A protein has these predicted regions:
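Flexible inter-domain linker/hinge segments
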Residues: 227-302, 306-314, 319-325
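Conserved N-terminal alpha-helix of the aminotransferase class I/II PLP-enzyme fold
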Residues: 278, 323-364, 369
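Gly-rich Lys/Arg/Thr-decorated short loops/hinges at beta-loop-alpha junctions or inter-strand turns
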Residues: 4-10, 118-120, 144-150, 177-181, ...
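Short Gly/Ser/Thr- and Asp/Glu-enriched loop/turn motifs at secondary-structure junctions
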Residues: 177-184, 211-218, 364, 406
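Conserved PLP-binding catalytic core of the aspartate aminotransferase-like
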Residues: 159, 172-201, 221-224
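Conserved PLP-enzyme active-site core in the AAT-like
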Residues: 1-107, 169, 173, 182, ...
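Conserved phosphate/anionic-ligand binding catalytic regions in large, soluble enzymes, centered on
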Residues: 69-82, 86-87, 131-135, 220, ...
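Active-site C-terminal subdomain of aminotransferase-like
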Residues: 67-168, 172, 177-179
Length: 470
């Protein structure tokens, strides 16, 4: 029921169990009640399923991990966010549009910049700047290389393996409960089989499955699943049921998706997704783009403080090893001891480097780190009975993400002046801190500053803020 206090709905497509719902009627009711609809969608499934924009969704979002980014134990992947044209001035992140250079040549450049935090600062629509640009580039090149036909072939192959497993595991006495699905199956077990039996057999074959609280068992297929893996999965259920099974030599293309849910429209229609489908073409295309880029291979480049680093090729090389790439984030902890040791070691080293007692490795960008720090400060202040403190002092030289993050975390901002060299104006800092001392929560300062300067007065700056109770 759409009560008056509901302003939006979030739907999953497919849902967490893998079932694909037909939301058309629900979306009509939501819009009739003046509710917006946001959909978390598996981007690869949309090669086969009707896209949410065609059945009325206002926003579609998700991760592009499925477009060529390995699991990395739940590590980074780029998100995607799509919406209607009418909302373009409110969406987070960068928008790129067509323009012309001074010679009249068509070019790409940032568009609608007046909505972004480097101009709008505390009035920006988000604190996002360039988080996960590398992963977004990888996903883009994946789509360029495979093109619409290649993407569809991959999606059809995944769905066909799922359909094959549904058909043959059902024959063994199980019941697949997802009425419609893309790549994920959920099986109700017969009375003669327990989830623990299946778990024991699966682990003996080095397979992890999903075990639901009600006793159901689930699995998800992806582009790395081949006929051999499908046979292993089938054998697990057959052995548990004590029944014979036939090994597949090949799995034909098949679809169980209903006509109402099947995608009919085209996608990836831009010419760039339809030109570079061989290794040589792709390599030359990437190199042409590379020649247009300014990087550390050419000269000094301006970098934000959260990206003042250089990852050498030698450091990137280990990331191509399957031990790093292929670890699923939900594996049992005893199967991820190496990863956990890396995480723990890095956390301990960062504690020593920073001089702090605790570390979070969850933030995926500088902007996310800012937000995390501010939320920790807010929680601390509330815990000591100082929750009324809601002002953040920020130097005028700070990157726009700083005031934007402060607003996102529920604070208000007070700007502190800087001198001609970009240093904090100490007199103005003292005055602003004293003026707001009863409500001051924190100072947000970049070290080195956005100008690349280490504040020589940093110790005195911290003393002033602490004296004000912040």
């Amino acid at each position: 029921e759409m009560t008056p206090d509901i302003f939006a709905c979030i739907l999953q497509y497919p849902n967490a169990s893998g079932n694909v719902e037909d939301y058309r009627t629900f979306v009509e009711k939501a819009h009739a009640a003046n509710c917006k609809v946001a959909v978390a969608a598996d981007i690869l499934s949309l090669a086969l399923l009707t896209p949410p924009g065609e059945w009325g969704a206002d926003i579609v979002f998700g991760t592009t991990q499925r477009l060529g980014t390995p699991m990395f134990y739940g590590g980074p992947s780029a998100g995607y966010f799509a919406t209607r044209d009418e909302y373009k001035r409110n969406i987070p992140g960068r928008i790129i549009g067509w323009s012309k250079d001074k010679y009249g040549k068509l070019c790409y450049r940032m568009a609608l910049q007046t909505r972004e935090q480097h101009i709008k600062r505390e009035k920006a629509t988000s604190n996002i700047c360039t988080a996960q640009a590398l992963l977004a580039t990888m996903a883009g090149f994946y789509a360029v290389y495979h093109g619409p036909e290649g993407i569809r072939t991959i999606a059809e192959r995944i769905h066909s393996i799922a359909a094959y497993l549904e058909k043959n595991i059902n024959k063994l006495g199980y019941k697949q409960v997802n009425e419609q699905y893309f790549d994920t199956l959920r099986f109700a077990l017969p009375d003669t089989v327990s989830a623990q039996q299946i778990r024991t057999i699966a682990l003996s074959k080095e397979v992890n499955l999903r075990y639901f609280h009600n006793g159901d068992v689930g699995m998800s297929i992806d582009e790395t699943t081949d006929v051999s893996a499908a046979n292993i999965l089938l054998s697990i259920f057959a052995i548990a049921a004590g029944k014979d099974w036939t090994k597949a030599e090949d799995i034909p293309v098949n679809s169980t998706i209903s006509k109402a849910l099947k995608r009919q429209s085209s996608y990836l229609t831009h010419e760039v997704f339809n030109k570079y489908h061989t290794e040589t073409e792709m390599m030359r295309y990437i190199k042409r783009l590379d020649r247009k880029d300014i990087s550390l291979a050419h000269s000094m480049i301006s970098l934000g403080s959260c990206t003042m680093k250089l990852n050498a090729a030698a450091e990137m090389l280990p990331l191509s090893r399957p031990e790093f790439m292929c670890m699923h984030p939900l594996v049992p902890e005893d199967q991820a001891e190496g990863y956990r040791e890396l995480i723990n070691n890095l956390s301990e080293e960062l504690k020593v480097i920073t001089g702090f007692a605790g570390v979070s490795l969850q933030p995926n960008s500088g902007a996310a780190g800012e937000y995390t720090g501010l939320r920790v400060i807010r929680a601390y202040l509330e815990n000591i009975g100082q929750g009324h403190r809601n002002k953040i002092l920020i130097p005028a030289s700070a990157h726009g993400t700083n005031p934007a993050s402060a607003i996102q975390a529920g604070f208000t901002t007070v700007t502190c002046a800087c001198d001609a060299q970009g240093n904090v104006d100490m007199d103005d800092l003292r005055a602003k801190a004293e003026e707001n001392k009863d409500d001051l929560a924190a100072l947000m300062i970049t070290y080195p500053s956005t100008h690349g300067i280490f504040e020589t007065e940093i110790v005195e700056i911290c003393r002033i803020i602490h004296e004000c109770g912040a």
